[in-house]
Every structure is written in C-alpha cells, then in structure tokens.
Amino acid sequence: MAKVIGIDLGTTNSCVAVMDGKNAKVIENAEGARTTPSIIAFTDGDERLAGQPAKRQAVTNPEGTLFAVKRLIGRRYDDPMVTKDKDLVPYKIVKGDNGDAWVEVHGKKYSPSQISAMILQKMKETAESYLGETVTQAVITVPAYFNDAQRQATKDAGKIAGLEVLRIINEPTAAALAYGLDKSEGKTIAVYDLGGGTFDVSVLEIGDGVFEVKSTNGDTFLGGEDFDIRLVEYLVAEFKKESGIDLKNDKLALQRLKEAAEKAKIELSSSQQTEINLPFITADQTGPKHLAIKLSRAKFESLVDDLVQRTVEPCKAALKDAGLKAGEIDEVVLVGGMTRMPKIQEVVKAFFGKEPHKGVNPDEVVAMGAAIQGGVLQGDVKDVLLLDVTPLSLGIETLGGVFTRLIERNTTIPTKKSQTFSTAEDNQSAVTIRVFQGEREMAADNKLLGQFDLVGIPPAPRGVPQIEVTFDIDANGIVNVSAKDKGTGKEHQIRIQASGGLTDADIEKMVKDAEANAEADKKRRESVEAKNQAESLVHSTEKSLAEYGDKVSADDKKAIEDAIAALKTSLEGEDAEDIKAKTQALAEVSMKLGQAMYEAAQAAEGAGAEGGEQASSSKDDVVDADYEEIDDNKKSS
C-alpha cells in the first residue's frame, strides 16, 4: 500500500515526513537538508528552481525569486495585508483575473496556489526519492487561523501538484499529535506556533490517544518575515544616516539586506551581538559603499518588541474561549523557528507562568504530526482520535447588513447546523444567501466566502416563506452551504468557492501546466545529464588520442577526430537526442583506441614480467639473508 506523506507547507521553509513503523520520520531533500526553503525562482532562461538552489541565486535575481507566497494564498488583491506586502517584496504582486492576489514573473501570472504547488512538488519528489515509489496522497498542514478561502487554496495547490489531499490539518494540532502520541496521562497543553509568516495558539486536552482542541486563535500575517522586514528597515535607515543613500528602491541591495537580516536574527538567538558586513552594497560618484553595522540582541529586541507583544492577545483569547486560566495549562509546546528567539521564550514564560517545553524540534514537529495523521487515515496508527475546531464563526448576512452566526468559532468539526429564515419583502421570489466568516457584528466587516441565489419562491407576504439555511463544515474546515424553501422543497447547495478562488477549470489547467513543467524539467535534466556524459567522453577520448594516437591507423584516428568534432558541435545546441546519438557514435569509433591501449598495456606487462624473473634469480642470496635476519630477531627477543 502506497505511503501517505505529511507535508508542512511553511511560509519560509517546508518539511516532509512519513510514518516509518510506529514513528514519524523526517525525510532529507536532495541537498541533504531536513527542511526546504519555500522559494521558487524563474531564471532568465526560464528555468524553474525550487528550494535551496532558488534561495542561492535570489541576490542576483530578486524579481524572479518568489518567497513567502503563502502570505498571499486565498487573499484578495485589495486586502490591506496584500497592499502592505506589495511594498516589501522585490517581486510583482498583481491582480488575478478573479480578483485574488497573484504574482507575475517575466510577464507571466501565477496564482499563489500554483507557486505553492511547485513547492509541494519538490516535497513530493523528496519523499519519492526516499521511498522509491510514487506518492499520490498527502496530509498538508495550514495555520489554525486560516479561513475557508485559504484552506481551499491550499487544497487546490495539492491538487495542482498531483496529490490527493486526504486532510488539511491545523499546524498546532499536528504539533500536538507529534508531541503527545506516546503520552498516556491526561494533560492540557497550549501550542504556541510562531513560524515564518503566521502565528497560531491552540489549547488542547490530550490523553489516551484523544486530542481535543478546546480553542484556537492567531494572526495570519505575523511571523519571522515581519521580524526580518523590521531589521531591514533599520539597516536602510542607518545606512542612509551614514551615507545619505537610500537603498529602499535598490532591489538587489534589498535582497542582500534581507539575507543578512535573516542571518543576523538567527545568530542573535545564541549570541549577544553580531556584525552585519555587506561590502559594495551600492556606489555613487565617490566610489563603492560598504555597509558595516554592529547589532546587539537588546537593540534587535527593541526593534521587534511590538511584534513579540502582538502574540499575547491571541493567547489571552484562546484561554478565554477554552474557559481556562494560564495556571491551568500543564505544558506549553513551542513550534516554529521564531520560538528559538530568547525574547519570545521570555514572553511565553511570563504569560503562562512556566518554562516552555523544548523537547520537540520546532522546524520538524508539524510535518511529523501531519505524517501521523496520514498514518491514522491509512489505518497504520491505531487508537488516535483527533477533534479539531473551526477557528472563525460562520454565518450569513441578514436584514440591515447584520452578521447572523450559525456556527460559533471553536466549534468541534466536522459539524452541521441549520437555521430557518424568511423573506424581507412581500412577494419576494428569490433570496441571495451571502456567506461570511469572522467575528465582527456587521457582515461587511467580515470575510465574504461566497454567495448564491435561491430562486422560485412562491409569492407570499414577507415573513411567511420558510427558508432553511444549513452550514456543513468537513474535517478539513472547508464549508458547504445549502438553502431550502420548506414550502416547495426547492434546494440550492454550494461548496463555498471563495469570492475569488480557483474554478475547477482553472485548477485543471494548472494541473496540466504543472505536468508539462515536470516534463520540461525532466527533459532539461536529461539534457544536462547527456551533456555531462558527452563532455566527459570527449575529454577522456582526446586524452587517450594524444597518448595512444600513434597506435591506431590513420583512418581510425581521423574517424575518431571527426566524431569528436561532431559531438562538440552537437554540444553547442540543446538537442538531447542528437547529443546522445553523437556520444554513442564516438563511443563506437573510439573502441579501436581502447583496443590499442589494451594491447600496449599487455605488452608492457609482458616485458615487466620477464624483467622480474631475471631480477628474482639474481637476488636469491638476499632473500636468504632476509630469513636469517628474522631468525636473529627471534633469538634476541
């Protein structure tokens, strides 16, 4: 039975794991690392790079390198968070045909789901390389505070990558699964998850294989990227103060600053001070300029203090919704690379009144939890029951633009809830059901998930028709809504498609694009491999020809030289088949050269053997003397 993989699709890094017996195992990628940068790059030659190779060339290709795209997934172009992001990233964020935020590289538009699918493909290939078999099913994690549109867009990304997404699971819940799988005693835990782009906090009760989420809260636009941005802004301001040059519009310099900021942030988790050195960051008429700034941990903490404090309110809200006090939490589990920052650990300790648990790897625990959930769904992991919740309230817009909740936040999923409504005017023959998600009292202040019309209502005075609206949330946290006229039995049902979102046709097209790209990537790899093989053969044949060319006939020598020339010409192009054919041709004609080399070696060996015999007969006495010496040694010992 094919394995189900668990993927932590992160903002900054992604990770893939699989069940190996009773334990979840994190799989190393082709570069030998256990996490993969969530970065996709398109080079000028239209080559697509994923992960570490993409990150390595970011400085020289800022506009073609896409990072932190997860922050755009499922968001509208006019979302205030997208507007903020547009000024902070070197690549282009544009308006998609459906009104969503998309990205543009080399004049081509991509949806965030497509870019995420490319990262998922890389994770899929990593798993396939380790398992030695094709992988088609996965459990993918999302921030607990993701809304329906963001969850749907993540599921679409999986589909585009050629994966059947068996379950979308919340990141803190996945972490709790990995943390608590082997713990039998009952505990109430809080999972504090501060990653590259999002923050979540979940309160769970765990024990005897039951993982019940009591509440969840968070901020889907708060993470390590914001800490990096804050540091970049500080470096830009300091450099301007010192040199009078503003680096804000220099995309190349900004990319270098971003890399340096990330490195400095990591270093300051273990040391009190670091130095940021960027030679030749820019130049003016007086010559090149260098950036050299010393940064202390205290200064960095003061720069990001408000970001750290922003994590406290969601913690308060999660405890309140769970009906608990901080002292009633038995253990606080830290998840996400940012939780390595000492200041964050201090704040967590101060809020919960206890040292946070550091026994899990914050970068890997989410993927491990996803793999465990995959094992549960496959039947390999027994006696585990996961009860998750919906993070935001769901409801519809009613008279006066009021938001009427049908399902409250932190309701255990899957769940189903119905409520009966009526018409607002006499003889109203149709009603528009507008579905929202959020916590504000007015519908317009919440996230519109979608809308649909129920038509054909018989004429009647206002308030008479009975329209039953039913909300159904599945285990992925994805919403289905239906409306039924009780009088006629007419029903209209929709799976909520975000007001933007991707249609089935869009997804189908993107799946085909992904497959075509995979084919193109495969061809490109084959071409590179063929070239490497050909160049190696040319080099070795030329070397042998220089050494043993006089051992073959003039005709054979010319045939070999012609074959080398033909292969060199072929290597200037990109036709892999032609390169392979010319390589084969050279291999065949150079066999004569191989034969000559073999004969020359044999002749040399024969001559060596003859000389050896003569030498041994003339040195018989020396051999005897050797034996004598050994005897003497024995005597003396």
Curated annotation (Swiss-Prot):
Membership in a protein family: Belongs to the heat shock protein 70 family.
Protein name in UniProt: Chaperone protein DnaK
A Pfam family recorded for this sequence: HSP70
Function per UniProt: Acts as a chaperone.
Keyword Nucleus: no
Protein's UniProt keywords contain Lipid biosynthesis: no
Gene symbol of the encoding locus: dnaK
SUPFAM superfamilies referenced in this protein's UniProt entry, alphabetically: Actin-like ATPase domain (SSF53067), Heat shock protein 70kD (HSP70), C-terminal subdomain (SSF100934), Heat shock protein 70kD (HSP70), peptide-binding domain (SSF100920)
Residues with the Phosphothreonine modification: T198
UniProt keyword terms in alphabetical order: ATP-binding, Chaperone, Nucleotide-binding, Phosphoprotein, Stress response
Organism: Brucella suis biovar 1 (strain 1330)
InterPro entries: ATPase_NBD (IPR043129), Chaperone_DnaK (IPR012725), Heat_shock_70_CS (IPR018181), HSP70_C_sf (IPR029048), HSP70_peptide-bd_sf (IPR029047), Hsp_70_fam (IPR013126)
Biased composition (Low complexity): 601-617
Induction profile: By stress conditions e.g. heat shock.
Compositional bias (Basic and acidic residues): 514-529
Molecular function terms from GO: ATP binding; ATP-dependent protein folding chaperone; unfolded protein binding
Region of interest (Disordered), residue spans: 514-542, 601-637
